[in-house]
Amino acid sequence: MALNKAEILDAIAGMTVLELSELIKEMEEKFGVSAAAAAVAVAAPAAGGAAAAAEEQTEFTVVLVEAGANKVSVIKAVRELTGLGLKEAKDLVDGAPKPVKEALPKADAEAAKKKLEEAGAKVEVK
């Protein structure tokens, strides 16, 4: 006979803190998960702005600051990175400083920066 959610919750409610701790450890072992991430997520809102400022940035924006001397190579690099057409890529390069790509993981942002710098552009990752 399977237990329903209400019965499981009632059983958990009747446990002591020590029993709950042991239950969590056994669940972590059985399912190969960690309850630490949930504890951090719950504690973060209570800590307020200090915790938010301490968090590592996960999304980055690649900003074209200046096209440099070799504008044609920069336009080609922008087209490869963004998939834009020739006119759109040229307008983006001419309108610098402008974001080229947004919400990228750090590795992708660094790769895009490297590609644009190799083409002769000045680039920032924010």
From Swiss-Prot:
Single GO BP term: translation
Gene Ontology CC terms: cytosolic large ribosomal subunit
Pfam families xref list: Ribosomal_L12 (PF00542), Ribosomal_L12_N (PF16320)
Keyword Ribosomal protein: yes
Highest taxon listed in the record's lineage: Bacteria
Gene3D superfamilies: 3.30.1390.10, Single helix bin (1.20.5.710)
GO molecular function: mRNA binding; structural constituent of ribosome
Signal peptide boundaries: none
Cysteine pairings via disulfide bonds: none
Keywords carried by this UniProt record: Ribonucleoprotein, Ribosomal protein
Primary role: Forms part of the ribosomal stalk which helps the ribosome interact with GTP-bound translation factors. Is thus essential for accurate translation.
Subunit structure, interactors included: Homodimer. Part of the ribosomal stalk of the 50S ribosomal subunit. Forms a multimeric L10(L12)X complex, where L10 forms an elongated spine to which 2 to 4 L12 dimers bind in a sequential fashion. Binds GTP-bound translation factors.
Similarity-based family: Belongs to the bacterial ribosomal protein bL12 family.
Protein name: Large ribosomal subunit protein bL12
Organism whose genome encodes this protein: Bordetella avium (strain 197N)
